[in-house]
Amino acid sequence: MGQKRQRDQKGPGSFAKKRKKSAKPSDATAEDSDWDGIVGMNELNWKEVALPDRLEDAGGFFGLEEIEGVDIIRSEGNGEIKFKKKEPEETNTQSDDEWEGFGDDDQAVSQEESKETQDEPNESDKKAKVKESKNAKKEKKKNAKDARKEQKEKAVESKEDKGIKSGLSFAALQEEEDDGADVSAWESLGLSPEILAGISKMKFTTPTSVQKACIPPILDGRDVIGKASTGSGKTLAFGIPILEYYLEKLRSKTQKDSEKTETTPIALVLSPTRELAHQLAKHIGEVVSHAPGVNARIALLTGGLSLQKQQRVLTNADIVIGTPGRVWEVLSSGHGLIRKMQAIKFLVIDEADRLLSEGHFKEAHEILAALDRVVDGEFPDESSDESDDELDPKSGRQTLVFSATFHRDLQQKLAGKGKWTGGDIMSQKESMEYLLQKLNFREEKPRFIDVNPVSQMAENLKEGIVECAAMEKDLFLYTLLLYHPKHRTLVFTNSISAVRRLTQLLQTLQLPALALHSSMAQKARLRSVERFSSPSSDPSSILVATDVAARGLDIKGIDFVVHYHAPRTADAYVHRSGRTARAGASGKSVIICSPDEMVGVVRLAAKVHANMANRKKVPLESLELDRRVVSRVKQRVTLAARIVDSNIAKEKVSSEDNWLRTAAEDLGVDYDSEEFDNAAARGRGRGRGRQERERKAGSTSKGELAGMRAELKQLLSQRVNVGVSERYLTSGRVDIEALLRGEGNNSFLGQVDPLDF
């Protein structure tokens, strides 16, 4: 009873059995040393990692090596790492479609596999079925889409066939043959037949003055600095010689029957804005598409688009056009791209005064320094002492510089209290010295071509000024737009917030307004420009923009430019006003000036029109608006401003509330909006009046907003009555027949005298 049961002693065999059981799942790691393909780390075929051309803050990550096609095996016991080469996949010599019949071994193997997989579902088959079903759905959608597209095309073709008369078929062919224009005026420039054919198809009968003056010296290999007024055709002045060099290179390549090598760009064109870069690519691309035998590939490098895609496009590009920021990002992050770009034959800097101005476009200076660096293999840091000795003293490329303003004095702020210099236009000597310090020209003295030395403004541009109170700018802007109902108008402001507010205000007043500023996404910016410039768009469309649209944009049909804010610098005014009166057309430019902006506007007139002092023409004419019109439309603008200010204030309060709520959650504290409001109400100081107005505007109820919208809608449904008796229509100077036909200005009911410049 008291004896304890003795436990059987376990011999070493039992421990061995346990070890065997535990070792079963790790047989692969225990016997990995016996596997074939395991090699030492130093025996692998390591490859050096290719670093970008310019890598900042590398932190010692130089000399990195990589290996492909190797499996890493880690032992469970001691954690030792071993490397095993992947076995190459055996290529199946027999085709999958070949059938060899059934065999006994195959049946036995298939039976065993079916028994093993009977209990467990095959996940790969399920995935394959799901994938097949998705592909089938995609194919069905694609087929349906193609069918609808074919039906539409057939319908369009049938409509076109119905509209064509049988007797006009040969006349249509003759019109296509006679499509080109007479380009005999271009023959003196020494252009090739291919380029002349493209110019003929584009209907450019005569070259502009800047094209006549600049194309021959560029074809002769000279460095050129071109100064011409806005809208004078500077793009083709450098685009045509680049395409001529492309054709010459193409002919020499075909004559020598040289082997095909990787494409090297022949030209780099830098522009300050994305919109201007897109426009340059469009204009040069039109010449390429119309000229027979010219197949130059253009790479457009601007922000807002895929960086990897632009790097791929750059590998086979002949002409590279872009903004400095994205061009430098692509070049510095790529492999061998800087070395490739050093072989370019043309460096074009459009709007050079903006790109080379102090404190702006740091990337432009980086690009210029990288293009001139001649170090074998690597590009050392710019801070090194030997960097000055490594710059190429004379570049082998042509440098072409174009702008409408080169005077550094024009970039001085007009409203500043600092020393104000005279308004004399920059002389040729001063411009040359300024650019020679910034750029590495091939020649000691590049050719300076000033087509219009007397005035920087277009000849057919009419300039005016409207004086008003600071709080009445919205009212006078709306009145000016009513005076020009069928004019495509461009409104410039000095801030992004003003663009957003004015766009909403004009849209509330039922005017077709679009916005353009630098904070917009790239696709939205392109969409706004496309809608504004489309021939099918409303002829009275309005584009409210910052100075991002001031340079280079060539939009046909802009008749009217309004400066809602006086420009900060004189060169900004020159480029803003240059959006109209382009290529010999007429245009108007009006500044809405408040009393605090008057000093800057007076300085502006003195700077821009310095050489017109002895002429009878007044540079900026004072325009008087009809006070009857201003008083009648004041109620409209007041209601629209209250609606817009209320919406903006509510959006601002909502965004601030969301930010404070998120910050409180991150800190782990309770958020009480009333407590924050009470604390803000106790504060004093600058900005309290504005905050109080925003709070009052944001507290407007939905019912009040609906009432204001209804009242505004009723006012907008009627014309502005300027002294017409609604009971006795035949009295006064009203032309009833013209009103019934819809002639004249449909915004007014009565006779309104147009603005006289």
Curated annotation (Swiss-Prot):
SMART domains: DEXDc (SM00487), HELICc (SM00490)
Limits of the Helicase C-terminal domain: 460-626
High-level lineage: Eukaryota, Fungi, Dikarya, Ascomycota, Pezizomycotina
EC number: 3.6.4.13
Pfam families reported for this sequence: DEAD, Helicase_C
Gene3D superfamilies per the UniProt record, alphabetical: P-loop containing nucleotide triphosphate hydrolases
Signal peptide feature range: none
Record key words, sorted: ATP-binding, Helicase, Hydrolase, Nucleotide-binding, Nucleus, Ribosome biogenesis, RNA-binding, rRNA processing
Positions bound to ATP: 228-235
The Helicase ATP-binding domain, residue ranges: 215-424
CDD domains membership: SF2_C_DEAD
Record's protein name: ATP-dependent RNA helicase mak5
GO biological-process terms attached to the record: rRNA processing
Purpose: ATP-binding RNA helicase involved in the biogenesis of 60S ribosomal subunits and is required for the normal formation of 25S and 5.8S rRNAs.
Motif Q motif per record, residues: 184-212
InterPro entries: DEAD/DEAH_box_helicase_dom (IPR011545), Helicase_ATP-bd (IPR014001), Helicase_C-like (IPR001650), P-loop_NTPase (IPR027417), RNA-helicase_DEAD-box_CS (IPR000629), RNA_helicase_DEAD_Q_motif (IPR014014)
Any GO MF annotation of the entry: RNA helicase activity
Family named by the database record: Belongs to the DEAD box helicase family. DDX24/MAK5 subfamily.
Compositionally biased spans, kind Acidic residues: 95-107
Basic and acidic residues bias locations: 1-10, 71-89, 112-136, 144-161
Region listing for Disordered, in residue ranges: 1-38, 66-161, 678-704
Location in or out of the cell: Nucleus, Nucleolus
One cellular component term from this protein's GO annotations in UniProt: nucleolus
